[in-house]
Amino acid sequence: MTSIKPAVEPPAPDHPAVTALPGIGARPAARPPVTSRWRWVPAFFGWFVGIQAILNFLSSISPFIRMVTKLPREFVDEYLFGWPDGSLSWAFVLSLLAAALAVRKSIAWWVLLIDLLGRSALNVGGFIEHRDTTELIGLVVHGAFILLLLLARKEFYAKVRRGATVKAALVLIAGMAAGTVLAWGLLELFPRTLVPGDRFWWALNRVAGFSIASHRDFDGLPPHFLNWLFGLFGALALIAAAIVLFRSQRAVNALTGDDESLIRGLLERYGQDDSLGYFATRRDKAVIFAPNGRAAVTYRVEVGVCLVSADPIGDKSAWGQAISAWLQVCDAYGWAPAVMGASAEGALAYREHGLNALELGDEAILYPRSFSISGPHMATVRQAVNRARRSGLSVRIRRHRELSAEETKQIIVNADLWRDGNTERGFSMALGRLGDSTDGDCLLVEAIDSTGDPVAMLSLVPWGTNGVSLELMRRSRQSPNGTIEFMVTELLTRAEGMGITRVSLNFVMFRSVYADGSRIGAGPVLRLWRSVLMFASRFWQFEQLYRSNVKYQPEWVPRFACYEDARLIPRIGIASVIAEGFLVLPFGNRDKPRHTGQYSAVPQAIVATGLLHHDGSTPELLPQTAPQQRVPEQVKVRLGKLAALQEKGIDTYPVGSPPSHTVAEALAAPDGSEVVISGRLLRIRDYGGVLFAQLRDWSAEVQLLIDDPRLHEEFTAAVDLGDLVEASGVMGQSNNGTRSVLVESWRIIGKCLHPLPDKRKGLTDPEARVRARYLDLAINPEAREQIAARSAIITSLRNTLLAQGFLEVETPILQQVHGGANARPFLTHINAYNLDLYLRIAPELYLKRLCVGGVEKVFELGRAFRNEGVDFSHNPEFTLLEAYQAHADYVTWAQTTQRLIQNAAKAAHGAEVVMRPGADGRLAPVDIGGEWPIVPVHEAVSRALGEEVNAATEVPTLQRFCQSAEVQFNPRWDAGHLVLELYERLVEKHTTSPTFYSDFPVSVSPLTRPHRSIAGLAERWDLVAWGVELGTAYTELTDPVEQRRRLYEQSLLAAGGDAEAMELDEDFLRAMEYAMAPTGGMGMGVDRVVMLITGRSIRETLPFPLAKPR
């Protein structure tokens, strides 16, 4: 958060989350580096004591094992470690000690050390008293273990609950006392032979002394079953004390007002991505912030698992620091780190810090723009909505802040009344509070019956600034079927009016199991797993949740669980069940509506800003500033000049006022003429007393002359090359006779912040010229000539047709059917109609509709799009001229097309010439005047092959010709396609001066009329010049029956996978059935005509050709 970033980053006092953290500039590590040679010791003692606990347990429940292990058990119990006969309680205590040792609990180290020291003392005493060398064996073992514990002392760093030792001692004393008193009372009732004076001491010995005194020390014996019961009393007291002593530190601290305020600030600034981010404000969670306060993770601790919900919140660049701080806290307290409900991006961040990720399920996301209940796949929802409407339901949608106090109370009452169960469930995907003043942006959707009473509600929390995430769903048992569907549909229908573009519904665990497990071919393991979940759904409604969401056809977004050790997954599962409220423990801290935190986790430097609110509301955020960019030194200098000018009150980007002259007009004006000109400075020469500058506008370039000392000083201090300048003065000449503007005043009208390329060399890299066309135009006269020539050519094409009485029209670019040419289209989608559309490959079919309507001369000059290759003559979007004339044919259009191109060449060059590279590589004019030849395509192919080819030549012969000419072909092609391939490879590429190739096979001309005299041919020509096809023309096919047959054949090719084949356009065919006059049509690639006339490539002639991403 830029607005509350501290100047320094001290750790927050009294909070473990920010102690001993790496610096912000360093990459945080998931764990401290493992360099200690004693790192293995806690695991060793954990396993050692754990095995002892297992053996104790087995010998306690199995007489056979107890008999087999009698001798070693007695030896171990006497000389090494405690192994009482048949004590389940002792096995339980040992298992708790083993677990505490494994997670590095410092208190477990002390317990084991004290136990070993005590047993060592007993061994020493036994040796002194009995001189038994066996005592020395035990002493050596104890000494080795004690030494190992002392050497590894720093490895047992995990903290325990504050005051856990005192609490454990009090529990033990209280338990022993209660057990002793109860045992004494039972002995008074059932003494058997035990004398009254020994009854209290017997009870104390059995309960608290674990039978240290022998029964021979007492007068008489109690009943046998009481002895077992008294031992159980002592064992229970010991177990309770051990649980208190060794159980994991639990995070009793929850959010404070400052914590929540900073979390809300992070959500306000960075909370656009995670739909679960707002649930971080749940007040029964604790929080750990990154040291700089720009990111945080929220968590709860259950059964020793530190459970984080969803992704970290805040700046993604600080996520690593927050995760690292959280993992260090887990280490400090011996918690097992785990995450529930992380997104794919969040799971990746956790994985980078040493955790593993497991897909948990999917979240259902709906987008109002594309949501619709029409169509067969939404029949269930549509029927439910109609049913709810018929029952008289209506829907009311409001923000929580719009509710009155009475309405809020009633909402809370209804939510409690309609809740299914006694416990409010949720942790990672539920808020757990209603009616809080800080949640005013939450959305309430209510279903209202015909009497005006609410019968159901949805509460949704904010998801960034343009989304909502479902938090609460309630309905009365009296609400009609379809109520929930009605509310969801109405929410999505009205969402865009409320600025909502995305809605997150429920999270569905194991969604893929339900989706894939019922499909044909699902494996036995998947089917078994689905059956298990189906059974579990009787209790937890997993399947019902899936069914209730899948009917809306949502987008499923995966969510992940993250963990450190796979062996801890069962415990993590239990912790998740507890956190989500499916298992309720006594003395829980769920659903706290108020702040109960004892201390704030916010870094002190942020607290000191005073921007946070103690009630937890969103802090006062300063406007977000753009990130600082590293700029070159020359740019820094120019920015400095800009700032200096602005400080003086000079507007460096003023409102425009037209100059009195262009540069060309000023140069034509006589000396002494007053002129005001503007343009870009391309060169500055300072000779001390006089300054010369070259100024260029679109028309020409002129020299500025400044000899006034004041103007000279101001100009040199403020101006750089590339600046746009307006200069006023009189026309004159310099000493060497150069025409100049003698400057009397000037002003900057646009400060250039980057240096220009070299004026003489310009942009030498062709790719740079494409990407920075604006610079190329600014400094390169040839680039200006190209764009001017293109404009002149397009204007000439338009004017030539307009002069012949043609109408210019515009037809749709977005089309439902791609047709008019054989080419691969671009596909897009319109959300309003949930409909796929194509960018047009040609306007032909719409122009022909106009011809059917009686427009006799019509043309369109516009953009077309083809998803094909990019090279010197192809660009994915291009300018296309298509024109149609009634009562004309392809011969008519040959004459018109020749005239169009010759006129365009004259407009660009002043003569009917095109520019072609000469022998020296330089462009030279080539005359294209006169009549252009018309050559039948079969004749041209025959010349190229040296073999006779005509319309009757059969396929095998044409295939043989292709093989001999090394022309590749598809064996399934007919004769027409083979001739076309031979033409394109052998004729078109080798053509020089403009030539019309005519009479193509019918099979490659689906929209062309059959030749009037030669069967199998179509009245079509292609115009080719210097290896490039410039255009094509047809005598149009006007027979609707034949047209339908040909387009049907094309549609079969499209259905068979031919991406370039035309689809069947029924609207076009229906229009043709109303009859179109005999018509000739022509299509011309305008970009290629510009290339022909200027001698440049398509990338040079287009102002902005498509360039690869950087």
Swiss-Prot record:
InterPro entries: Aa-tRNA-synt_II (IPR004364), aa-tRNA-synth_II (IPR006195), aa-tRNA-synth_II/BPL/LPL (IPR045864), LPG_synthase_C (IPR024320), Lys-tRNA-ligase_II (IPR002313), Lys-tRNA-ligase_II_N (IPR044136), Lys-tRNA-synth_II_C (IPR018149), NA-bd_OB-fold (IPR012340). Keywords: Aminoacyl-tRNA synthetase, Antibiotic resistance, ATP-binding, Cell membrane, DNA-binding, Ligase, Lipid metabolism, Magnesium, Membrane, Metal-binding, Multifunctional enzyme, Nucleotide-binding, Transferase, Transmembrane, Transmembrane helix, Virulence. GO terms for biological process: lipid metabolic process; lysyl-tRNA aminoacylation; response to antibiotic. Mg(2+) 1 binds at D1022, E1029. One of its GO terms (cellular component) is cytosol. It is found in: Cell membrane. Its EC number is 6.1.1.6, 2.3.2.3. Residues 621-1110 are annotated as: Lysine--tRNA ligase. It is a multi-pass membrane protein. The keyword Zinc does not apply. It holds the Pfam family tRNA-synt_2. Its cofactor is Mg(2+). Residues 1-620 are annotated as: Phosphatidylglycerol lysyltransferase. NCBIfam families: lysS_bact, PRK00484.1, PRK02983.1. PANTHER family: LYSINE--TRNA LIGASE, CHLOROPLASTIC_MITOCHONDRIAL, LYSYL-TRNA SYNTHETASE. In the N-terminal section; belongs to the LPG synthetase family. In the C-terminal section; belongs to the class-II aminoacyl-tRNA synthetase family. This is Lysylphosphatidylglycerol biosynthesis bifunctional protein LysX. It comes from Mycobacteroides abscessus (strain ATCC 19977 / DSM 44196 / CCUG 20993 / CIP 104536 / JCM 13569 / NCTC 13031 / TMC 1543 / L948). The lineage of its organism: Bacteria, Bacillati, Actinomycetota, Actinomycetes, Mycobacteriales.
